[in-house]
Swiss-Prot record:
Entry's cofactor comment: Binds 1 zinc ion per subunit.
Family: Belongs to the archaeal MetE family.
PANTHER family per the UniProt record, alphabetical: 5-METHYLTETRAHYDROPTEROYLTRIGLUTAMATE--HOMOCYSTEINE METHYLTRANSFERASE (PTHR30519)
CDD domains from the UniProt entry: CIMS_C_terminal_like
Protein name: Methionine synthase
Organism annotation: Pyrococcus furiosus (strain ATCC 43587 / DSM 3638 / JCM 8422 / Vc1)
Residues annotated as signal peptide: none
UniProt-listed Gene3D superfamilies: 3.20.20.210
Pfam family, any one: Meth_synt_2
Length: 338
């Protein structure tokens, strides 16, 4: 399978329509039937998909319209977790932090329904399914059952592995493990790496790993060891500085973050075009995908959309330059190719 060179994608989240946020609130208060809420989520999913497609994104997703939060969504579906109530993340932001109170078990698919709905309603051949990784789920949950963190994390890795196999069986081509917490404790990075590798054991499709702004020099020490196809990382947030760690990346792709998801200023097409060209100092264009730094959900929806539009326009400009060198397409690599 071939894709245009410098394929464009998203990381995961996208601003929810205001009417969907109202439905979330009504659901929380028990004032609407669950079927009404699910219908609203499906409608929002299609709306965001169309927005991504209209922006020109090659590999879209639905912006996680059915997910209230990136760990809560998964822990609510895994047997053995219990919720005690919300905890503060920052400012006035809260999430329901789960506690493992029994052995964790895979009872039902976690994101299969999401994937099948998106697959059915997109015009694109490939979508990217974001899944919160085992280490981050453990790090952002309480442990009231397991004797140590390793057994907690590795049981979650087994569960994610089962989910990936279900998705692959139903035609998924590209999943992305989100591990924003994996570099929090340098001494535990080997555990996070082992968990990722266990989660992808026996998987053949394309697997990306997204790690938010952090110490990428530490991550780079494990580039070869981590069994994924692609690393999706933030660069706009650091003004494209300190990129020398990319010299350690070989035979794996880079998802190059080119728009800042924390800044409402919309980067110009020319700014993004120049940023893209910087990465060619380290990697051949055939090994680069283009995406935002991270999920876009904290931005105003119009701003998020315009950032995607400008990102795609910048990519198209660089593609025209690469076309003069005979570079127009790339192979869609999977774990089998790495």
């Amino acid at each position: 399978m071939e894709l245009p060179i410098l394929p464009t994608s998203v990381i995961g989240s996208y601003p929810k329509p205001r009417w969907l946020l109202r439905m979330y609130k009504l659901r929380e208060l028990g004032k609407i039937p669950e079927e009404d809420f699910k219908e609203a989520v499906r409608d929002a999913s299609i709306s965001v998909l169309r927005e991504h497609e209209r922006a020109g994104i090659d590999i879209p997703w639905d912006g996680e319209m059915g997910r209230s939060e990136m760990t809560e969504y998964f822990t609510s579906k895994i047997k053995g977790f219990k919720f005690y109530g919300p905890v503060r993340v920052w400012g006035n932001a809260y999430f329901n932090k789960a506690a493992a109170v029994d052995k964790l078990e895979y009872e039902e698919p976690l994101v299969l329904d999401e994937f099948l709905w998106v697959k059915e309603n997109t015009t694109r051949e490939i979508v990217k399914i974001p899944i919160t990784g085992p280490y981050t789920i453990a790090e952002w949950s309480f442990n009231e059952y397991y004797p140590d963190k390793e057994s907690f994390v590795m049981d979650l890795a087994e569960i994610i592995n089962k989910e990936l196999k279900v998705l692959e069986k139903h035609g998924a081509k590209f999943v992305q493990l989100d591990e924003p917490a994996m570099l929090n404790h340098p001494s535990e990075v080997p555990l996070a790496v082992d968990a990722i590798n266990r989660a992808v054991k026996g998987i053949k499709m394309k697997v990306g790993l997204h790690v938010c702004y952090s110490n990428y020099n530490l991550l780079a020490d494990y580039f070869d060891e981590i069994k994924v196809t692609q690393f999706a990382l933030e660069f706009a947030n650091r003004n494209f500085r300190d990129m020398d760690f990319l010299k350690k990346l070989s035979n794996k792709e880079l998802g190059f973050g080119v728009v800042d998801v924390h800044n409402p200023r919309v980067e110009s097409v020319e700014e993004i075009r120049q940023a893209i060209k910087k990465v060619f100092t380290y990697l051949e264009p055939e090994w680069v995908y283009i995406n935002p730094d991270c999920g876009l959900k904290l931005l105003d929806r119009k701003i998020a959309y315009q950032k995607l539009v400008n990102m795609v326009q910048a990519v198209r400009g660089v593609r025209k330059e690469l076309e003069k060198e005979g570079k127009t397409t790339i192979e869609f690599r999977t774990l089998k190719d790495i």
